[in-house]
Regions:
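Short, well-formed alpha-helical segments that are part of the catalytic scaffolds
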Residues: 12-30
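Glycine-rich, basic loop-to-helix element that forms the pyrophosphate-binding segment
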Residues: 44-60
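Short aromatic/hydrophobic "clamp" motif used to bind/position activated sugar donors
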Residues: 65
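The conserved acidic donor/metal-binding loop of glycosyltransferases
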Residues: 69-73
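Conserved donor NDP-sugar-binding/catalytic core segment of glycosyltransferases
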Residues: 79-111
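Acidic donor-binding loop at a coil-to-helix junction in glycosyltransferase catalytic cores
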Residues: 156-162
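Active-site donor/metal-binding and catalytic loop motifs
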Residues: 176-199
Length: 199
């Protein structure tokens, strides 16, 4: 069987099963869904989030992989735009886009940009509502470039440690100038510990 163009990887929790189901329903009704696989891993919290991400990564068959957590959201054209970018830009190692983020009630936009340094995050726009950073695990990564990168066995910081590895293996990027992903963090409901440094 021909591998899919994109593997969407979702670590999930049983206490958010309705959110996970809504995400899947949103994905399957988008044009281009026949070219992807959506892998969802539920567990009883016996594994860390890092190990859940690692298991999903090792199970993926797509040419590209992208993480979408069960409490995140995607645009109505998320699948379509990513499949178009993958097919029209075969040279790309990573495909970036913009993200709508809501962090403990504070909304802002994240502009993922290949080559941007997280240690020099650039806050732009009125009231510092736009943040520029390097490609994150939610972006679409060519699997052959990053399949050997390992997630840490931890419930916090596994994403940053993984992208620090992955960025070293990509040289060419394509950016989609649109918000395709929505990230929500609420300290009242998250299963991860609160970071010591907040955005």
């Amino acid at each position: 069987m021909k591998p899919p163009l994109l593997s969407i990887l979702t670590p999930a929790c049983w206490n958010r099963v309705e959110q996970g189901r809504a995400l899947h329903e949103k994905l399957i009704h988008q044009p281009g869904f026949s070219h992807i696989e959506h892998l969802v891993l539920y567990d009883n919290r016996a594994r860390s989030i890092g190990m859940k991400r690692q298991a999903l990564l090792e199970s993926a068959r797509g040419d590209f992989i992208a993480f979408v957590d069960d409490d995140d959201d995607v645009s109505e054209d998320y699948v379509t735009r990513l499949i178009e970018a993958i097919t029209q830009h075969p040279e790309a190692d990573v495909i970036t886009f913009d993200q709508s983020a809501i962090y403990n009630g504070k909304p802002f936009t994240v502009h993922f940009q290949h080559g941007a340094k997280d240690d020099k995050l650039m806050l732009e726009g009125p009231d510092n509502q736009c943040l520029t950073r390097g490609p994150w695990h939610v972006c679409a990564w060519r699997r052959t470039k990053i399949r050997h990168c390992q997630f840490l066995d931890t419930n916090y910081g596994e994403d940053a440690a993984w992208v620090a590895q992955a960025r070293q293996h990509v040289t060419r990027a394509h950016h989609i100038d649109a918000i395709l992903h929505t990230y929500r963090h609420d300290a009242r409901t998250t299963l991860a510990p609160e970071p010591t440094q907040r955005l």
